[in-house]
Amino acid sequence: MQQVITQTLVDDRFIQISDSKKSEGLATDSTKRQSQEQPIHDKDPIKAATAAMATTPLVKEHQDTWYYPPDIANDLQSINLPAELKGEIFACAWEYTRCVIPNYTNWNRYVAFMRIIIMGIIAEFRGEMVDVTASNNLLGYDLDATLAALFEGTPGHKEMAREYKTFLLITADKASERRDGELFRRYVNALAQSPRHWFRMRDCDALARFTIASALACNDLDDIWFTEDQFEILTEIGDTLYDAVAFYKHRAEGETNSTFAYMPEDLRIKAYSECREILWALDAAWARNPKLANVINFVRFFGGPIHMMMRRYRFVEENLTIGKSETDKVVDQTRKNFKLWNRVDANKRSVLNTQRYKALIARSEELMFPGLAEFLEMGGDGICDKCKYRESTVQNCHTSLVVLNYAANADYRGEST
């Protein structure tokens, strides 16, 4: 393991502390100044203490030391990002990998998965740096070679390559100015077609089936694969659990792919409870099949515990609580990419860029999971008279989000709104 950097968050500013300063304790300019301004001698110690308290701001300090294996320490060498930010990205990728795939037998595949997650993290908050349509070289990685390092020899190699490229395509558009274009407009509108379409699109956005496939690959379980129906069930359970816990995080981010943004609040608790029960039932049913433990481990950790164990989430900052409503400060920090979060603010314009969109549809067998092109074509302009959609005009007053009502009204997963 390698210690990378220590950061302290003071009033939303990162202060790097050198090893020599660590032994001396934290001393920012403001605290030094306060100690100089306070009287050295005072006949009334109570008065002096009161004065000191009055001049000392209530600052919540939080210090992180990043750890990750040396295999990824020299990645992103040619990428223009601050060293401390790279350290946080590497640590986030390592922590996520350890949480969702806690067991592994193939270290090389495990490292490839970390690199996949590194690319994904950057796509989520620096979308302009990632364009899967332009080149196979992303952030200094050979994308196809990295995917091959993870999946070569598995039954899902080609399928998972398309899955991940779809994730990069949509996620990077969402986190960049490209979200003003025709592709993302249609993507957001298409979310409303049906619950089944919603969960398939959310599955890709969360890399849910991709991580299940990765867990199998990292444990050399190349003889196991799931049917489409099985993937849908597993990912719907995992995404429902995750989105229920991440509800306020998603709200702080203005996240379009948040299941419970589109249904009555009381359904969030009920859905989480039922999916958790199903997860434990499935776990018990598969208990004597150790090969399937890797799949259950992913769904279990993804469904909640990562919010406590990963430093990407605010469990420590919010006094060891989960499910705390976002504040203006949290939203502001999200805009500044604190904890690698990203705010998708509503846009007041939409760019009619149909040429790029048509070119991407033509490459859908390379850049989109099976069925997504049809989702975009069928539902890109909206199919429900009760929903509000982004219009395809140069200037409009609609937000970047589509307001859905399917989850509250649909009685079964295949029903359209």
Swiss-Prot record:
Disruption phenotype: Impairs the production of abscisic acid (ABA). Induction: Expression is enhanced at 60 and 90 minutes after the addition of the ABA precursor mevalonic acid (MVA) to the medium, but declined after 120 min. It is an enzyme of class 4 (lyase). Pathway: Hormone biosynthesis. Coiled coil: none annotated. It comes from the Eukaryota. Its EC number is 4.2.3.-. GO terms for molecular function: lyase activity. Keywords: Lyase, Virulence. GO terms for biological process: abscisic acid biosynthetic process. Alpha-ionylideneethane synthase; part of the gene cluster that mediates the biosynthesis of abscisic acid (ABA), a phytohormone that acts antagonistically toward salicylic acid (SA), jasmonic acid (JA) and ethylene (ETH) signaling, to impede plant defense responses. The first step of the pathway catalyzes the reaction from farnesyl diphosphate to alpha-ionylideneethane performed by the alpha-ionylideneethane synthase aba3 via a three-step reaction mechanism involving 2 neutral intermediates, beta-farnesene and allofarnesene. Belongs to the alpha-ionylideneethane synthase family. This is Alpha-ionylideneethane synthase aba3.
